[in-house]
Amino acid sequence: MPELKVEVIPEGTVIDHIPAGKWLKVIEILGLTKPNGGTLLIASNVPSKKLGRKDIVKVEGRYLSEEEVNKIALIAPDATVNIVRDYKIVEKFKVSIPDEIVGILTCPNPNCVSNHEYVRPRFKVESREPLKLRCHYCERTIEGEEIIGNL
């Protein structure tokens, strides 16, 4: 397999093993599409032994919050996050979907109390493969692209 050459970042976060074509959604949910979003390096549709094809996002000078990592897990459940300091990976971990997701998604049910009252949307994970979530308030289930569309 040919060597992948992507510039090394001095400080920041590398998100690897994103399914091919999902990099744009990742940078949108992280707010990196704005002019002051930070320096990005993106490798799209690159060969991967694990996924066949994958995307990689490098964010210079920025580290992710737990909520941001949880959002990434909903889009790319097999993603790996690398924390880089002084050009070296100092921490590496796989994202994981928490058992309960609070305040990240909106419920697609227009009649759900979470869309009308001051309560944080809350979802329980019913299954991880395929990913299926159930709203705590109205019991509506969502899965697949509907989850991504409600981030």
UniProtKB/Swiss-Prot annotation:
<dbReference type="Pfam" id="PF01948">
    <property type="entry name" value="PyrI"/>
</dbReference>
<dbReference type="Pfam" id="PF02748">
    <property type="entry name" value="PyrI_C"/>
</dbReference>
<keyword id="KW-0479">Metal-binding</keyword>
<dbReference type="GO" id="GO:0046872">
    <property type="term" value="F:metal ion binding"/>
</dbReference>
<protein>
    <recommendedName>
        <fullName>Aspartate carbamoyltransferase regulatory chain</fullName>
    </recommendedName>
</protein>
<feature type="binding site">
    <location>
        <position position="138"/>
    </location>
    <ligand>
        <name>Zn(2+)</name>
    </ligand>
</feature>
<dbReference type="GO" id="GO:0006207">
    <property type="term" value="P:'de novo' pyrimidine nucleobase biosynthetic process"/>
</dbReference>
<dbReference type="InterPro" id="IPR002801">
    <property type="entry name" value="Asp_carbamoylTrfase_reg"/>
</dbReference>
<dbReference type="GO" id="GO:0009347">
    <property type="term" value="C:aspartate carbamoyltransferase complex"/>
</dbReference>
<dbReference type="InterPro" id="IPR020545">
    <property type="entry name" value="Asp_carbamoyltransf_reg_N"/>
</dbReference>
<comment type="subunit">
    <text>Contains catalytic and regulatory chains.</text>
</comment>
<dbReference type="InterPro" id="IPR020542">
    <property type="entry name" value="Asp_carbamoyltrfase_reg_C"/>
</dbReference>
<keyword id="KW-0862">Zinc</keyword>
<dbReference type="InterPro" id="IPR036792">
    <property type="entry name" value="Asp_carbatrfase_reg_C_sf"/>
</dbReference>
<dbReference type="GO" id="GO:0006221">
    <property type="term" value="P:pyrimidine nucleotide biosynthetic process"/>
</dbReference>
<keyword id="KW-0665">Pyrimidine biosynthesis</keyword>
<feature type="binding site">
    <location>
        <position position="112"/>
    </location>
    <ligand>
        <name>Zn(2+)</name>
    </ligand>
</feature>
<comment type="similarity">
    <text>Belongs to the PyrI family.</text>
</comment>
<comment type="function">
    <text>Involved in allosteric regulation of aspartate carbamoyltransferase.</text>
</comment>
<dbReference type="InterPro" id="IPR036793">
    <property type="entry name" value="Asp_carbatrfase_reg_N_sf"/>
</dbReference>
<feature type="binding site">
    <location>
        <position position="107"/>
    </location>
    <ligand>
        <name>Zn(2+)</name>
    </ligand>
</feature>
<feature type="binding site">
    <location>
        <position position="135"/>
    </location>
    <ligand>
        <name>Zn(2+)</name>
    </ligand>
</feature>
